[in-house]
């Protein structure tokens, strides 16, 4: 028995919506409490001092201050903090 898909069908005809991930506020920028600093999948960058982490791993400011990106800790991880 011959196996052939119905004419006109395709497996590739779709595209996902953009997710707008990435850094929203850069190092040295002044931010207010609640400002989103970084949207990401997983914790590529970890929250430091005065930074919170949402359920989708979005990092946001807990206090007003200046954004600071740095590397540190025992595992040499990337962090973002807010300097008041």
Swiss-Prot record:
One of its GO terms (cellular component) is cytosolic large ribosomal subunit. GO terms for biological process: translation. GO terms for molecular function: structural constituent of ribosome. Keywords: Ribonucleoprotein, Ribosomal protein. It holds the Pfam family Ribosomal_L27. InterPro entries: Ribosomal_bL27, Ribosomal_bL27_CS. Residues 1-20 are annotated as: Disordered. It comes from the Bacteria. NCBIfam families: L27. Belongs to the bacterial ribosomal protein bL27 family. HAMAP family: Ribosomal_bL27. This is Large ribosomal subunit protein bL27. The lineage of its organism: Bacteria, Pseudomonadati, Pseudomonadota, Gammaproteobacteria, Thiotrichales.
């Amino acid at each position: 028995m011959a196996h052939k898909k119905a004419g006109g069908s395709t497996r590739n005809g779709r595209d996902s919506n953009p997710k707008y991930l990435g850094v929203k506020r850069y190092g040295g920028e002044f931010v207010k409490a609640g400002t989103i600093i970084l949207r990401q999948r997983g914790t590529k960058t970890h929250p430091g001092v005065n930074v919170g982490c949402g359920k989708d791993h979005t990092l946001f400011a807990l206090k007003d201050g200046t954004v600071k990106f740095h590397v540190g800790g025992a595992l040499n991880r990337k962090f973002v903090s807010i300097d008041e």
